[in-house]
Swiss-Prot record:
GO biological process, one term: neuron fate commitment
Organism: Mus musculus
Classification via PANTHER family: MYELIN TRANSCRIPTION FACTOR 1-LIKE PROTEIN, MYELIN TRANSCRIPTION FACTOR 1-RELATED
Family, per entry: Belongs to the MYT1 family.
A GO term for molecular function: DNA-binding transcription factor activity
Upper classification of the organism: Eukaryota, Metazoa, Chordata, Craniata, Vertebrata
Name used for this protein in its record: Myelin transcription factor 1-like protein
Length: 1187
């Protein structure tokens, strides 16, 4: 029977273990209880809870099957320390106050909850032994009930784990209740649903706790009866000792910290919800607690030494059972009573308990959000330690039982008990392992959910910050108070999803709580600006901030901006760095006058946004009469212009002609000390209407320098015109770039020493032809009586005015002036003679003798184009430099000019429209007919007149010397356009009915160079004698169709630009080129021959040098051998004395050798015996020398 019961118990245990785990794997860690949505769970109210432990729905269904066996007559132990309890005492209680409120199955709860505390090692040891004995009790119950209660066994095993989680739920519910109670005064009636949900949750928890206590009471009563039967049936003292150990386990577990914490939590819950517990319950609880303490002390003694007195055992058992049953019943009744009162209480009628201070709530709130993962982690670590310590203790306990049984029990009983205890501990160990895994998985899942929620909240906050961002920010004190309030009020609402929206506004930097922000203590700051922890921002959040438009000033972080403290500011307005750079640049350029550049637009233009007044710095002490406003629509164009152009102040002596025209100011700004007076003289006769009738008038001034001097003028008109914002921006930007294109490199010779009053004179005697070509004579003096009353900088300076004035240095006199636009139809052309002297005095010349044209376009835009005449100022020493060679500059100019259809000008840089084939069209839209288009990138004027004389290209009109042309006194002008003589003859020809041929010589040769073009369809009309491709419709189409090569294009351009009249010259030139090529070829052949000869001679020279080197080497070797031979000879003949000679040595070696040679040559002469002996000795001496 024992074996069968063990097998059956083992099967039921394994089933009970596997039931809550398998659904977790199948359903992605969702709660396996059918119909449970995760609310009310102990471990954090997670819908994905992976076990039935802590599930209130599972407990409710389970307790419905078990009805309470007997009523609870006592409700004692919940008000012992009700007055002194607080939030901080939820985990700190005396060990003497709640002994009666124990239940038998708190043994399992105590093992986990005590691990949670991790403070008392002694209690850990006692609990482990208690756990072991409880399992043995369960084993004996299985033995007694053979037909058994498999289902009940399974439910009891689940209850052991569920009650552990239930106690945690009670404590967490109490913590949340403390936080919610504190917020009752701060929340209005909009959040009543949250309190209702919370009350419902607490009521459910209390009901479940009561049912658990009821089940525990029933089980304790059943086990006590079974234990009594078991003790009567067992005959050995070892069984008595074992029963005594079980009773001791029961009484010891009643004193666990879990029950004390539960009691404290219930008392605080009762106080928080207005429920008052009776005092008699408290008194009785205390009395029972004292009696239980006595019995517990007795049991401690009995646990150490087995007692053989049966009466003592029964007395202890009865007292323990009575205390346990009464305590469990009291706990159950208290839970039911509190839940009922809580459900009947209205949330609005609750009052905050007076003994809960704000400090306790703040502390509770701060500890709460991180409590769940910390507790889970500590549970896991403590369970691992418990698992390691369980196995040795079980073995020790089994061995002790065996030793006791050796004297009073047989071997069979001892072996059965030891096997049961080992099986119990193995099962307990398996359950703890599963619980450990569950806690670890739950911890990871909670961490992942928190990170995901934080990321989502950061993204939503960033998106929302872009929509409802306002430039105005709260004061520092308001920010601090609000942030501190929100920090206090921020609980963790795990259940209600509506609360998550109120926690989203915070700094998106992970781990940043708002401290250290530039803008103050902002936990809810929604952007990265001002955050000291930007380096910790993950790439996901940075990706959302990549498209933020920031302040374009390099190195600007957004701090110090006038209108906001945002680094996402999109303009230069209000930027302190930009303002400081502009001021420093202006001062630096004012001080250095070595290189002069243009200064066009107002400093105001660079600050297009709001708060301009705060950054307006009056420069050099001159005040501004009219404040400037700038349309915001021009922001992009003004910023573009600011990035491309530089502005500069220039001065020459004490006289300044350059005025910085600031729309719509009346007075202009000056640099030199006398400039302010000059400005008053310029505008002394101004009428108020001339400066105030236009809402937005374009402003530009031309600062044209000649050497270090600065001279400029401003166009003026009495009438004002309304400009669109785009036109104004395009004009200002184009003027700023165009005026950079001219520079006069030499100092003026005869600059006037006093500022001049600039006016213009009307001349009613001038006349124009149908094309608007003027006849302007340089020697014709104009009356200087009529002058315009005022110069106001309301009109833009036309490009032709800038180009002409920048091409020469001019001189101003007091009487010189310029006028308003003139009606050309009333003017008569004047001629000029070739005998006119080149140098003209200032008295005989008007600086602005050219009349101004006035043409109106649909937009009512008037473009005055004054064309001044002036004496030569070192014409041969100046160059006109343009930007036309830069494709980017030309492209930008054209794009800016194309923004307005009413203001269409010739796109050639520096061209004012004069000299065009189609007439004097300042508004010409293309390069066709432009005389300067073919010179792009080339200096317009030669640096020396000698170069002009080498290849003279004159005006083709017979009798015209070039004087009086619209473009100036160009004797070398190569087109009839702009020629006053040609215009007059053409008009006469039209009036007489005969076609005008403006060139009488070589008319047939003057034709359009485009092949097959007869001159018809040209822009300028049917010009058979037109000699360029400009305006030819066939040239463009032919080029597009044929796609001419570069050489062909170059040939056509050369024919058009050089004015070649016929192909004969080309043939002649080709022949000359051929002859030159032939001569060059012959010369090249001769050069090749010479090079060949030179190469041959060089090779021979090298050969000779090599031979000489060989000879030198041989000579050296011979000399070396001769020296050796002479030494040998001297050594050999040292002992031989020739007659009449000294012994041989280096000094007389040559003479000695000569004598010997002579002796051997003429041996006949030396026939005497002495000589023969001498010769024989010499032979013997020389015989040893080898040559």
């Amino acid at each position: 029977m024992d074996v069968d019961s063990e097998e059956k118990r083992h099967r039921t245990r394994s089933k009970g273990v596997r039931v809550p785990v398998e659904p977790a794997i199948q359903e992605l860690f969702s709660c396996p209880t059918p119909g449970c949505d995760g609310s009310g769970h102990v471990s954090g109210k997670y819908a994905r809870h992976r076990s039935v432990y802590g599930c209130p729905l599972a407990k409710k269904r389970k307790t419905q099957d078990k009805q309470p066996q007997e009523p609870a007559p006592k409700r004692k132990p919940f008000a012992v320390k009700a007055d002194s309890s607080s939030v901080d005492e939820c985990y700190e209680s005396d060990g003497t106050e709640d002994m009666d409120d124990k239940e038998e199955d708190d043994d399992e709860e105590f093992s986990e909850d005590n691990d949670e505390q991790g403070d008392d090692d002694d209690e850990d040891e006692v609990d482990r032994e208690d756990e072991e004995e409880i399992e043995e009790e369960d084993d004996e119950e299985d033995d007694d009930d053979e037909d058994g209660d498999d289902v009940e066994e399974e439910e009891e095993d689940d209850d052991e784990e569920e009650e552990e989680e239930e106690e945690e739920e009670e404590n967490e519910d109490h913590q949340m209740s403390c936080t919610r109670i504190m917020q009752d005064t701060d929340k209005d009636d909009n959040n009543n649903d949250e309190y209702d949900n919370y009350d419902e949750l607490v009521a459910k928890s209390l009901l479940n706790l009561g049912k658990i206590a009821e089940d525990a009471a029933y089980r304790a009563r059943t086990e006590s009866e079974m234990n009594s039967n078991t003790s009567n049936s067992l005959e050995d003292d070892s069984d008595k000792n074992e029963n005594l150990g079980r009773k001791s386990e029961l009484s010891l577990d009643l004193d666990s910290d879990v029950v004390r914490e539960t009691v404290d939590s219930l008392k605080l819950l009762a106080q928080g919800h207005g429920v008052v517990l009776s005092e008699n319950i408290s008194d009785r609880s205390y009395a029972e607690g004292m009696s239980q303490q006595d019995s517990r002390n007795m049991n401690y003694v009995m646990l150490g030494k087995p007692m053989n007195n049966g009466l003592m055992e029964k007395m202890v058992e009865e007292s323990d059972e009575e205390v346990c049953l009464s305590s469990l019943e009291c706990l159950r009744n208290q839970c039911f009573d509190l839940a009922r009162k809580l459900s009947e209480t209205n949330p609005q009628d609750r009052s905050q308990p007076p003994n809960m201070s704000v400090r306790q709530h703040v502390r509770q709130e701060d500890d709460f959000p991180g409590r769940t993962p910390d507790r889970s982690y500590s549970d896991m670590m403590n369970l691992m330690r418990l698992e390691e310590q369980l196995s040795p203790r079980s073995r020790t306990f089994s061995s002790c039982a065996k030793e006791d049984g050796c004297h009073e029990r047989d071997d069979d009983t001892t072996s059965v008990n030891s096997d049961r205890s080992e099986e119990v501990f193995d099962m307990t160990k398996g359950n703890l392992t599963l619980l450990e895994k569950a806690i670890a998985l739950e911890t990871e899942r909670a961490k992942a959910m928190r990170e995901k929620m934080a990321m989502d909240a950061g993204r939503r906050d960033n998106l929302r910050s872009y929509e409802d961002q306002s430039p105005r920010q709260l004061a520092g004190e308001d920010r601090k108070s609000k942030s501190s309030d929100s920090h206090v009020k921020k609980p963790y609402y795990g259940k209600d999803p509506s609360r998550t929206e109120k926690r989203e506004s915070k700094c998106p930097t992970p781990g940043c709580d708002g401290t250290g922000h530039v803008t103050g203590l902002y936990p809810h700051h929604r952007s990265l600006s001002g955050c000291p922890h930007k380096d910790r921002v993950p790439p996901e959040i940075l990706a959302m901030h990549e498209n933020v438009l920031k302040c374009p000033t390099p190195g600007c972080t957004g701090r110090g901006h006038v209108n906001s403290n945002r680094n996402s500011h999109r303009s230069l307005s209000g930027c302190p760095i930009a303002a400081a750079e502009k001021l420093a640049k202006a001062q630096e350029k004012h001080q250095s006058c070595d290189v002069s550049k243009s200064n066009q637009a107002s400093d105001r233009v660079l600050r297009p946004m709001c708060f301009v007044k705060q950054l307006e710095i009056p420069q050099y002490g001159y005040r501004n009469n009219v404040p400037t406003t700038t349309p915001r629509s021009n922001l992009a164009k003004e910023l573009e212009k600011y990035s491309k152009t530089s502005f500069e102040y220039n001065s020459y002596d004490n006289h300044t002609y350059g005025k910085r025209a600031i729309a719509p100011k009346v007075q202009t700004r000056d640099i030199s000390p006398k400039g302010y007076d000059d400005a008053k003289r310029y505008c002394k006769n101004a009428s108020p209407s001339s400066s105030t009738t236009s809402s937005y008038a374009p402003s530009s001034s031309s600062n044209l320098s000649c050497g270090g001097g600065s001279s400029a003028s401003s166009t003026c008109s009495k009438s004002s015109f309304d400009y669109t914002h785009d036109m104004e921006a395009a004009h200002m930007a184009a003027t700023a770039i165009l005026n950079l294109s001219t520079r006069c490199r030499e100092m003026p010779q005869n600059l006037s020493t006093k500022p001049q009053d600039l006016c213009t004179a009307r001349n009613p005697d001038m006349e124009v032809d149908e094309n608007g070509t003027l006849d302007l004579s340089m020697n014709k003096q104009r009356p200087r009586d009529s002058c315009c009353p005022v110069l106001t900088p309301l009109e833009p300076m036309s490009p032709q005015q800038q180009a002409v004035m920048s091409s020469r240095c001019f001189q101003l006199s007091e009487g010189d002036c310029w006028d308003l636009p003139v009606d050309y139809t009333k003017m008569k052309p004047r001629r000029v003679d070739e005998d006119e002297p080149k140098e003209i005095t200032p008295e005989d010349l008007d600086p602005f003798q050219e009349a101004l044209e006035e043409r109106r376009y649909p937009g009512e835009v008037t473009i005055p184009s004054p064309k001044p005449k002036y004496p030569q100022c070192k014409e041969s020493k100046k160059d006109l430099i343009t930007l036309s060679g830069c494709p980017l500059a030309d492209k930008s100019i054209r794009s800016m000019l194309a923004t307005s259809s009413q203001e269409l000008k010739c796109p050639t840089p520096g061209c004012d429209g004069s000299g065009h084939i189609t007439g004097n069209y300042a508004s010409h839209r293309s390069l066709s007919g432009c005389p300067r288009a073919k010179k792009s990138g080339i200096r317009i004027a030669q640096s020396k007149e000698d170069k002009e004389d080498q290849e003279p290209i004159r005006c083709p009109v017979p009798g015209c010397d070039g004087q009086g042309h619209i473009t100036g006194k160009y004797a070398s002008h190569r087109s009839a356009s702009g020629c006053p003589l040609a215009a007059k003859r053409q008009k006469d020809g039209y009036l007489n009915g005969s076609q005008f041929s403006w060139k009488s010589v070589k008319t047939e040769g003057m034709s359009c160079p485009t092949p097959g073009c007869d001159g018809s369809g040209h822009v300028s009309g049917s010009f058979l004698t037109h000699r360029s491709l400009s305006g030819c419709p066939r040239a463009t189409s032919a080029m597009k169709k044929a796609k001419l090569s570069g050489e062909q294009m170059l040939t056509i351009k050369q024919r058009a630009s050089n004015g070649i009249e016929n192909d004969e010259e080309i043939k002649q030139l080709d022949e000359e080129i051929k002859e030159l090529n032939e001569s060059n070829s012959q010369m090249e052949a001769d050069m090749i021959k010479l090079r060949t000869q030179i190469t041959t001679m060089e090779s021979n020279l090298k050969t000779i040098e090599e031979e000489n080197k060989v000879i030198e080497q041989q000579n050296e070797s011979l000399l070396h051998e001769l020296a050796n031979l002479s030494q040998s000879l001297i050594h050999s003949l040292a002992n031989i004395q020739l007659p009449h000679m000294d012994p041989i040595n280096e000094q007389n070696f040559d003479a000695y050798v000569t004598t010997l040679t002579e002796m051997y040559t003429n041996q006949d002469r030396y026939q005497s015996p002495e000589n023969k002996a001498l010769l024989e000795n010499i032979k013997q001496a020389v015989r040893g020398i080898q040559v």
